[in-house]
Amino acid sequence: MWKWILTHCASAFPHLPGCCCCCFLLLFLVSSVPVTCQALGQDMVSPEATNSSSSSFSSPSSAGRHVRSYNHLQGDVRWRKLFSFTKYFLKIEKNGKVSGTKKENCPYSILEITSVEIGVVAVKAINSNYYLAMNKKGKLYGSKEFNNDCKLKERIEENGYNTYASFNWQHNGRQMYVALNGKGAPRRGQKTRRKNTSAHFLPMVVHS
């Protein structure tokens, strides 16, 4: 290409010396450099902007919001055992009594957790057919029929455990939580707080 430019320049201006042709060539090269650099600069900046945009979606604060609450679709069903921070499996016996057990193979601790709406679940003991329920006084009991006492708000806490609060009832504006004390006995909802470890449970998968 440069040979053609030199030849063309010499033929177009035969009366000019060779150094002038070289000057024309130099001016041509200088004028083409900014365009090339500008195009190259755009190519280099574009991927960086894309990566920056992508990283904003995976920021720690964004990830934290996603892992703090469940978004199960209505009708989602899971079989689990709820293992409390106090080292008890929550169970609902055939007479409807709610308590904790140390026995890993207790049939009354196998629970069916069903999402009734976003963030709200129903917990039912498979072998006793009782729903986990909390009345307006904060007492845990087993209910044969699904009612408003059986609706529980399921939440993931910072330590990775779940909490289950009454969906319909509060005490003095405070949430009331499902909880087992250090002896495996249920605690009254009025005495519970979200930060109390007695209200923290690990959902453990039940293998058939």
From Swiss-Prot:
The keyword Transmembrane does not apply. Glycans are attached at N51, N196. Residues 1-37 form the signal peptide. InterPro entries: Fibroblast_GF_fam (IPR002209), IL1/FGF (IPR008996). It holds the Pfam family FGF. SMART domains: FGF. It comes from the Eukaryota. The keyword Iron does not apply. Keywords: Disease variant, Ectodermal dysplasia, Glycoprotein, Growth factor, Lacrimo-auriculo-dento-digital syndrome, Secreted, Signal. PROSITE patterns: HBGF_FGF (PS00247). Interacts with FGFR1 and FGFR2. Interacts with FGFBP1. It is linked to Aplasia of lacrimal and salivary glands: A rare condition characterized by dry conjunctival mucosae, irritable eyes, epiphora (constant tearing), and xerostomia (dryness of the mouth), which increases risk of dental erosion, dental caries, periodontal disease, and oral infections. ALSG has variable expressivity, and affected individuals may have aplasia or hypoplasia of the lacrimal, parotid, submandibular, and sublingual glands and absence of the lacrimal puncta. Belongs to the heparin-binding growth factors family. Plays an important role in the regulation of embryonic development, cell proliferation and cell differentiation. Required for normal branching morphogenesis. May play a role in wound healing. This is Fibroblast growth factor 10. The gene is FGF10.
